[in-house]
Amino acid sequence: MSATTDAGQLAEFNRCSTAEQYFDLLEVDYDPRVVAVNRLHILKHFAGELAKLQDAGADTENPRHLLRDYRDALVRSYEAFTNAGALDHRLFKVLKDRAPQAADFVPTSEITVQRPGSTQPSETSERTEEAR
């Protein structure tokens, strides 16, 4: 590819508005069924990957390198949802809020058994018996 083609492809990347457009432009093979089910999740993950690239100081001067980094980010985002589901990643607030909470833990040393009809001894009566 020439530099002009790379620059044009980068300009086209900035005009993409659908997941399929990103996949086609960056020449990433994909299963349309996976994209149909996970479209928003893949795009959200991809946006996060692009933000990481920007924070890491991606080579914005060289369109070819930038497009390669974008392609790698899209592949990672797509593979994240071919290997696991949306509930595993919980990218959106509605899914984060519905995340399973860890069960409260009660150690066995804290469990006491009381027979029906018997009264639970109080601390003062136990101390009294110990003093005798």
Curated annotation (Swiss-Prot):
InterPro entries recorded: NifW (IPR004893)
Signal peptide positions on this chain: none
Positions of the UniProt region annotated as Disordered: 106-132
TM region(s), chain numbering: none
Entry keywords, A to Z: Nitrogen fixation
Pfam name, any one: NifW
GO biological process annotation, one example: nitrogen fixation
This protein's record includes keyword Calcium: no
Record's keyword annotation contains Amino-acid biosynthesis: no
Residue ranges with Polar residues bias: 109-123
Primary role: May protect the nitrogenase Fe-Mo protein from oxidative damage.
Subunit: Homotrimer; associates with NifD.
Family matches, as HAMAP family: NifW
Family from the record: Belongs to the NifW family.
Protein name: Nitrogenase-stabilizing/protective protein NifW
